[in-house]
Amino acid sequence: MPDIACQPHQDPQGKLNWVGMSGIELPIKIEQDSQTLTLSSQVQAYVSLDDPLSKGIHMSRLYLILDEMGSNAPLNPASIQTLLTAFIESHQGLSQNAFVEFRFDYYERRRSLKSDNSGWKHYPCTLRGEMRNGQFECEISISVPYSSTCPCSAALSRQLIQEAFEQQFNGQDLDYNQVLEWLGTPEGICATPHSQRSYAQVKLKVNAEHPLNLSNVINQIEDAVKTPVQSTVKREDEQEFARLNATNLMFCEDAARRLQAKLESCPEYKDYWVRVNHLESLHPHDAVAIVTKNVPGGYSDEPNFMERFQN
């Protein structure tokens, strides 16, 4: 059968940075503790077209390599490196560089704060790999929701409570039980600080030997911010959630610095990029802070916007 992709190209001639496919629907395998999950993903796959005389690449070869990997090998940095090597080998004489990206939704059961319950939580994830001039790079991206309570609003609320107390008991001699009883009334908490669902968007550069453990990445992020959103909640869980928010008041700057400190303590990450988004309940806009590891040739500090963080 004729294959015009193998015929020489005439005019105009030129090399192309990337040629390939996007929106590929592919089941993938992700290892989670002692089990292997099968998840649906959307994939981009590309190779460079380095021969200006070639009409094009062989897209079916990329697809077949992807299909074989998705059916057999769990997705991790090592398997992505193997995949990219196979992309380039399948285009000998045409391509020196390769790129792949997997976007998927990772679900995990997370325990409630106090009660003996657990529930599903959803984390949008992306795994990217690139082989350029023989050098391999791999990136893990994840979006983790948490709660943030405004320190300024908390201080203003405390002031109103103090004023209400003074107005109610001005000049009176009080005993312990009177104060305790008043604190349990609606008037005892006449103002509450505003809080909001917030998102930590994190990109991590890892080596090929890095064992992909998304649960560990989630734990590191949630341990840093201290206020992860909850799925299954009983009254004791909601009360503990309120306590955690009160003891972890955060501007977006505070959340970014907490994540910075956590990731700096993790030698397994060659580089990181963090964007925290506080979806303000007080304002119609978001409060945002961005931090990178600032390694030479590493992530840019451009405030680009990761997609799907509100999913």
Swiss-Prot record:
InterPro entries, sorted: GTP_cyclohydrolase_FolE2, GTP_cyclohydrolase_FolE2/MptA
Swiss-Prot/TrEMBL GO biological process terms: tetrahydrofolate biosynthetic process
GO molecular function, one term: GTP cyclohydrolase I activity
Family, similarity comment: Belongs to the GTP cyclohydrolase IV family.
Swiss-Prot/TrEMBL keywords: Hydrolase
Biological role stated in the UniProt entry: Converts GTP to 7,8-dihydroneopterin triphosphate.
Disulfide bond entries: none
The enzyme's E.C. designation: 3.5.4.16
Keyword Membrane applies: no
Pathway: Cofactor biosynthesis; 7,8-dihydroneopterin triphosphate biosynthesis; 7,8-dihydroneopterin triphosphate from GTP: step 1/1
Reactions listed under catalytic activity: GTP + H2O = 7,8-dihydroneopterin 3'-triphosphate + formate + H(+)
Superkingdom: Bacteria
Keyword Hydrolase recorded: yes
Chain positions of site May be catalytically important: C150
Transmembrane parts of this sequence: none
Family matches, as HAMAP family: GTP_cyclohydrol_B (MF_01527_B)
Top-tier EC class: hydrolase
Stretches of the chain forming a coiled coil according to its record: none
Identification of the protein by name: GTP cyclohydrolase FolE2
